[in-house]
Structures are given as C-alpha cells and as structure tokens.
Regions:
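Nucleotide/phosphate-binding catalytic cleft detector across ATP-hydrolyzing
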Residues: 3-128, 139-339
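Conserved Rossmann-like nucleotide-cofactor binding loop
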Residues: 134
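Residues immediately flanking
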Residues: 131
Length: 339
C-alpha cells in the first residue's frame, strides 16, 4: 500500500509462503510493478510461522532477506509489536518483536478514528475487528494506545484476541463437527474437501473468481464448483443435493464463525474497566459481512455500550481495507519517519 492518500494504491496478492518462500522477492517485485513513486519501504509481516521455516527466528530472517533482495536495506523500516521501527538487521536480531506485527500496526493506526477525550483520563475506548482469509483479530484500543499486553500470537490466542478462522482458507471439518442434512445432523468427513471460501461463494458474500484455482479440489473459485466441494464434506456430490441442502451447510458454517466472533468480542470487551465503555467498533478486512451478522441483533451494542460502527471499507475503499495492515504501516511510516 502507498502512503499517499491521493494515490489510492493498494494491492493484495496471494502467496503460499509454506510452498514457495524462496520466491517471495519475485512476488514483491511483481506487486510493486505499477506502484506510485516511493522513497522508503515500511514492512510489517506475517507468515514467519509457516512450517517451511524451522523456527520463528528463521522465518523472520528469511522474510527480511527476501525483502532486501528487492529493496535496499537502508530504505527498509520494520514495524515491531512495541510500536517502534527497526532496520532489517536489528529486526533479525530480535525476531520475536518483529514477528506477526501486522495486527499491532493496524490497531495503532486505527486509534485515529476514536474521538479526542473531552475530560482528562477519560479517553475514548474502541475495539478493532479485522477479518481476513485465515484469521480474525479482535483488539481493544484507546486514543492513547493499543490496550493489550499481548506480544505474540500465542498470547493473543489465549486472550481470545486472535481467532484462527477466516472467510476463505479455513478447513470446514476443523470448524464444525456436523451440519444439517435432510432433517438430521450429519457429521463432516475429516478431509480437505471444502473451505470457508466455498460457503461464502455459495451464500453470495464472496465474488466468484473463475481464474483462481487455489481451492480444495484445484477447480475454479465459482459458486457452482463450491456447490460440489460443499457436498463432498457430507459424502454427497453437487448433483445429489438440492440448493436448500447446500444453503443449510453454508449457513451452518457462517453461524459457527459468528458464534466464535461473538465469544471473542464478549471476552475482549469484558476486560474494559467498569467505569469505561467501548464506544466504537472498527471493522477492516474483506470479511466485514461476518461482523455485520454478529452485531445484527444489537445485543452486543446494548450490553457493552457500543455507539458507533466504523467500516474502513467505506472510509478507505475496498482495496485499502483488504490490505489494511499494509496501508496502516505506510501511514505510520509517513507520519513518524523521515521517509
């Protein structure tokens, strides 16, 4: 993403780190082939935990080595989970503070959407919900900082600030144990037959992409092919089930993800001191429809005092919202560094 708001340039490209980590530099070079002019590179990362790397430190070092193949090291600034910047060599020497820093960059930047406090020591409180293809981040923040003690993914998992489920890549048999079928509950086959992307392609929440074959059966990411993938998880195929059967499977998947998100929000919002309320909820990522479903009945807003919903897709546009951590880190760099 580019820091110049007038440029309106963000790009998101899929990259199978666990399969082709040595090709990251080539993918980065491709990503910037149409970018506006830039004078520095702000880096925030995820992917260092991919199982092609022996350790997280190895992952951080390899990612930074690939980055500096494309961009000269003096131009590269690495954002870290303490909110500070480091050079690539410094970040490689302190990998745990550089690893998986994307959520913190986005939360730190998102604080600007909270109103300025009218009374000292009564800063506005908010919660950021970033829903992507693989994970969901739920991070409490205030006008004066990111309000979590978490530094690592395992910290966030234990605090329910990281939900390891997303709207595209999550395996359905790891999400739900059974789905409704012909009036009964049918257990799922423990196979990589379908993912959450298929559920949302079928339900119409995700756009079709016929040229994309990064799916469970390597067939196109279309609604019709999603039908067959969803049918397989209950031992059927697309020709034996009615539309209503596929609807029920897809809706069951969505209901489970809504349930997980609701539990996470209740846990995170429940940590707010008793004399404070979280007034704003900020949504980013391309899975905002899941948050809308979660908030639809109004019970969370009533229970926790949520007054305003801020949708970055509306404020920034779809591409910036989908690439929100990259956009956020570009903005933070432009504001805080002499780039």
């Amino acid at each position: 993403a580019h820091s110049d708001a007038e440029a309106k340039w963000s790009k998101s490209l899929p990259f199978a780190m666990w399969k082709q980590s040595a090709s990251l530099a080539a993918s980065l070079a491709q990503a910037i082939d149409d970018s506006p002019e830039f004078h520095g590179i702000a880096v925030t990362m995820t992917g260092e935990l991919a199982d092609c790397f022996s350790t997280r430190a190895h992952g951080v070092a390899c990612i930074l080595e690939q980055v500096t193949r494309v961009f000269p090291a003096p131009l590269v600034y690495v954002y870290c989970v303490d909110g500070n910047w480091r050079s690539p060599s410094q970040a490689a020497r302190d990998p745990w503070i550089a690893a998986a820093s994307n959520w913190h960059a986005l939360a730190n930047w998102s604080r600007r959407f909270l109103p300025k406090p009218r009374v000292k020591d009564q800063e506005a409180q908010g919660v950021l919900v970033d829903i992507g293809s693989t994970t969901i981040d739920v991070i409490r923040l205030a006008a004066n900082g990111v309000k979590t003690a978490s530094k690592t993914d395992s910290d966030r998992l234990k605090r329910r600030e990281l939900i390891y489920t997303g709207i595209e890549r999550s395996n359905l048999c790891g999400l739900v144990r059974s789905v409704p079928l012909h009036g009964k509950r049918c257990p799922l086959m423990n196979e990589q037959f379908a993912t959450t992307r298929d559920a949302y392609l079928w339900l119409g929440f995700l756009d079709e992409c016929p040229e994309d074959k990064d799916t469970a059966d390597s067939q196109p990411a279309t609604r019709e092919h999603a039908r067959f993938r969803l049918a397989r998880i209950v031992g059927e195929d697309g020709s034996t089930l009615a539309d209503s059967d596929i609807d029920a499977i897809g809706q069951c998947v969505m209901n489970q993800q809504v349930k997980l998100l609701r539990k996470s929000l209740e846990k995170v919002l429940g940590k707010v001191p008793g004399d404070r309320q979280v007034s704003h909820i900020i949504s980013s990522g391309h899975g905002g429809f899941l948050l809308r479903q979660t908030l639809e009945d109004g019970s969370l807003a009533q229970r926790f005092g949520l007054q305003e919903q801020i949708w970055l897709e509306d404020r920034l546009g779809q591409e910036h919202s989908r690439s929100a951590p990259a956009y956020a880190v570009s903005q933070l760099a432009a504001e805080n560094l002499q780039v």
